[in-house]
């Protein structure tokens, strides 16, 4: 049985990966009176006077909404809200299994930015945080920014920031392996969508001075036509030498390549044109921009992908459960750049320096201390 056949069979057997489980026994009239009427009126009255009491008396304190419109799902594209539900259920499972957080999948049947913002705003009182998922660019940028500005709970688009955090964590350790400094590195980020933009922003915040973004059109510069508003904004802080040309041109003399783009678009010749001891993260899924063996053969020293069957898996699951765990426990109202940097450093630190190697730069997702380490790092930077 193939993986695809097994996955389909199991999803049919599961009939959904989630269920509601009661924490409250209802085995007697007294149980019923306490869990529901008339006893339930007492916490209602307290919360009516002070909405913050909802964190004490309801599941809000440890529950997030996983919200999608199904417009940019994995490598499947715009498949809509019904087809997106298995992914959102899966995300909720990861929240619970890796972070101990309750998560509710919500798939919205609209692509309208205003309607999505309204829907999430109306739903927000029941949740301690909002995880936006698989919403296409550039709409995702506006949706997140406006929700962050209006809601008093953390709003986090994991496709952007979770990806950026794990990429930075991997690069921090890879630089130790190859003995380079961030100030001396040229970075090429291929893919100027949600993940590529967020990765670039976080690398800039961390202190990389020389980043060139590329997209289908090649190098993204101030002269590139057809850019969306966010891509245009990124030209103001990237490509300091105003390079032009193709991806191949951008990779010449680069020290770090991060791909969040398309399968098979990086050649061995491109990798060979990079500087010695190059770091290459080919994160297109399921087929990376270049296969790891070919990248190493062409001269790359540290190679990461998004896949679990290769060394150096760069996967969001080591980030988002701990980030939300810390944000919820610390009652953060936002997830800030400081918290993202702290999370990346915490993830990187989970691989002891004496164990770092070309093929070991990322912590294993199943290490029990990952979420707690990230959560503590996030909590230490909460300044509400």
Q: Residue locations for each model-derived region?
A:
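Glycine-rich phosphate/diphosphate-binding loop of Rossmann-like nucleotide-binding domains
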Residues: 74, 79-99, 157, 165-262
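Adenosine-phosphate binding glycine-rich loop
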Residues: 158, 282-384
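Rossmann-like adenosine-cofactor binding region
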Residues: 232-302, 307-309
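Solvent-exposed alpha-helices and their adjacent loops that cap or buttress functional pockets
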Residues: 12, 55-60, 96-97, 122-124, ...
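Short, ordered loop/turn segments at secondary-structure junctions
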Residues: 69-71, 79, 108-109, 134-137, ...
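General beta-strand structural signal in soluble alpha/beta enzymes
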Residues: 105, 131-134, 155-158, 189, ...
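N-terminal ligand-binding/catalytic initiation module
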Residues: 1-153, 375, 381
